[in-house]
Amino acid sequence: MQSHIRAFVLDKDRKPLMPCHAAKARKLLKKGKAAVFRRFPFTIILKERTREASAIQDVLVKVDPGSKSTGLAVVRKDEKNVHHALAFICLNHRGSKIRDALTSRRQLRRGRRSRNLRYRAPRFLNRKKPKGWLAPSLQHRVDAVMSWMNRLTRLVPVAGFVQELVKFDTQLMQNAAISGVEY
C-alpha cells in the first residue's frame, strides 16, 4: 500500500478538513497547534480549529479497480471543473494468496475424505451458496476497497465517489481481424 502527496487534517472534534501540504503539517506540529492522529495515512488533528472556521471544498474519491491492485485518488474540483490530486493510494490485493491457501486446504480435505473408511454414508453436493455469494478472493477485493472508502470519508470531506468502469475485448486486442465463430 502506498500513499502520496498530502497530509490529512481533522479538526478538534475529529471532523475532516481539507488535506494540507506535508510542510504545513510539519509547521503546525512544531508550533504545537496540531498532533499526530494516525501515521498511515498520515493524519494530524488540530487542537483549536473547528470545521465551521475552515474553508472546505468538494472532494471526490476516484476508484480504479483492477485484478491485482486498485487505485484510489482523492481529488478536489476547482471553479473550472479541473481536478487536482490530493492523495493517491494503491491497494495491492491478496487474491492469488487466498486462492493458493484455499487450494491447499482443499487438497488436504480431499486426502482425508478419500481414505478407505467403511460404513460411512457417502457425501454428495448438498451445500448451496447464499444469494450474492462471491469467491473469497473477490470478496476480499470488495471488502478492502469498501473499508478504504469508509476510512477516507472519516479523513476527508468527501462529496462523492467515482468508479472507473472499463470493458476490454482482449481477443480483439490480440487479433484485429477476429470475427464470427473465431470468438
Q: Where are the model-predicted features located?
A:
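Positively charged, helix-rich recognition surfaces that bind polyanionic ligands
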Residues: 3-26, 30-33, 37-56, 65-70, ...
